[in-house]
Amino acid sequence: MNKTFDNGAVASTSYRNSKNYDSNWISAGYAVWFLREAKFLNQARLTLNTSCAVSGTGFFVSAKIIERNGGWKWHLLTEDIEFSANSILEGERISYTPTAVLYDEQPVTFRDSWNQRFRWAKGFYQVFWHYGARLAKGIATNPKAAASPATICS
């Protein structure tokens, strides 16, 4: 992450992995989800030189962004997705650092996983209602710089 920052990135996300992938099928499912997110979304976006998306933990944001916004101003239920959407709208590119790996402990019960996924779904809709129209407009005017809500929240 330090090299990514030193190369001029103002925000970057890491490869988020599951610490307890071998606990059961639920935690293993999260590991597969994170692998998909890393390889097929963020790595692809890095290759195409478009903005990646912050998801959960394991990311950095430069002090410049925090200062310019008067602190951390993103407070929707899924503030990571909100930050990503807002960054795209402001023309800030989020990078991806594939060599930085963060291990998160994931839910192992269906109930905990369900509750978390339900919270994420509600957060997605919050971001969609706050940012969806502006993101869609950005797709029409500058397809490379913008991302649709469905793409950013994948």
Annotate each predicted stretch with a short phrase:
Residues 2-76, 114, 118, 125-129:
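Long helical/loop segments within the catalytic core of UDP-sugar-dependent glycosyltransferases
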Residues 21, 104-105:
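Generic structural signal for helix capping and beta-alpha/helix-loop junctions
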Residues 48-49, 108-154:
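Basic/Trp-rich segment in TM-proximal cytosolic loops or flexible interdomain/linker regions
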Residues 49, 75, 84-102:
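Catalytic donor-sugar/metal-binding loop of nucleotide-sugar-dependent glycosyltransferases
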Residues 57, 90-92, 111:
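Structural beta-strand/beta-sheet cores of well-ordered domains, especially the beta-sheet scaffolds
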Residues 63-64, 81, 100:
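Structural detector for helix-capping/boundary residues
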Residues 83-84, 113:
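Short, hydrophobic alpha-helical packing/hinge segments within bilobed ligand-binding/sensory domains
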